[in-house]
UniProtKB/Swiss-Prot annotation:
Residues reported to bind D-ribose 5-phosphate: D225, N229, T230, G231, Q232, T233
Subcellular locations according to the entry: Cytoplasm
Name under which the protein is recorded: Putative ribose-phosphate pyrophosphokinase 1
Pathway note: Metabolic intermediate biosynthesis; 5-phospho-alpha-D-ribose 1-diphosphate biosynthesis; 5-phospho-alpha-D-ribose 1-diphosphate from D-ribose 5-phosphate (route I): step 1/1
Gene Ontology terms, MF aspect: ATP binding; kinase activity; magnesium ion binding; ribose phosphate diphosphokinase activity
Catalytic activity as recorded in UniProt: D-ribose 5-phosphate + ATP = 5-phospho-alpha-D-ribose 1-diphosphate + AMP + H(+)
SUPFAM superfamilies (UniProt xref): PRTase-like
Amino acid sequence: MTENYQDDTLRIFSLNANRPLAEKIAASVGTELGKSTVRQFSDGEIQINIEESIRGDHVYIIQATNAPVNDHLMELLILIDALKRASAKTVNVILPYYGYARQDRTAKPREPITAKLVANMLVEAGATRLLTLDLHTVQVQGFFDIPVDNLFTMPLFAHYYRQQALVGEEIVIVSPKNSGVQRARSLSEYLDATLAIVDHEEIDGVRQEGYVIGNVAGKKCILVDDILNTGQTLATAAEVLMKNGAQEVYACASHGLLSEGAKATLENAPIKEISITDSVYTTADRQPATLNIISCAELMGEALLRIHENKPMSPLFRLEPKGE
């Protein structure tokens, strides 16, 4: 934590999506959140008022775009516009979770690429830089015409699992789907562990029971994904691993959306512990009993300071948390 950061031109504002994380980030930087109010009229319109001068300042907005996605996105766009009109020197968006990132290509004919549309909206509103965490696909960075820094969560999870002695050849890092192999490989390298994949075949459009590519018999397995929404992907993969002789199953995901029904799905799954970051705020009633939350605040706070002080970001891509 930096105490009383000595630069009055650095200003941090938070909207409604994840104020607890914003407060932690501000504390790690050594400053307080700026004062603003967000109102919603009876017809759903959003109004934002900045309650202090930010003229000539470098402003950082902390806002995830999780559910309600469209409300949180509109809050962000409106505040960007307000800051620009109030003569902020730069408007830097800290987006711990990028909603719509999964719509990054046309999977079917006549589908939109909404991740690109959102990028256009943020830039057009007046954002001058974006800092985000574990994009669904790193190619989304290319949708922007402004600098984008995409931090990774695997070093955070690796640090935690090292503390739990979940390292070495007896540990298998498992991707629950083909598209997540790169993320799983990254964690396996941090933990000196082996790699496996849970795959599924489709016959006549019907998804078949999953099978394992790799050896998990008698091993402790860690499932890795970026987004934990309904929990079904991890739950199904955990069942496949146990059927194939896994000793224990753990899971981690960068963003814990935990939509309705996820708690029951995960508590009924053969998963000993599920780790997520606090990139998305979730209420206690949606958190399964097996949940473990690892804060990304220090990582994002350090990135914010490096941006503000024009320091390189590269050391953060293999961050070793303090106390390692």
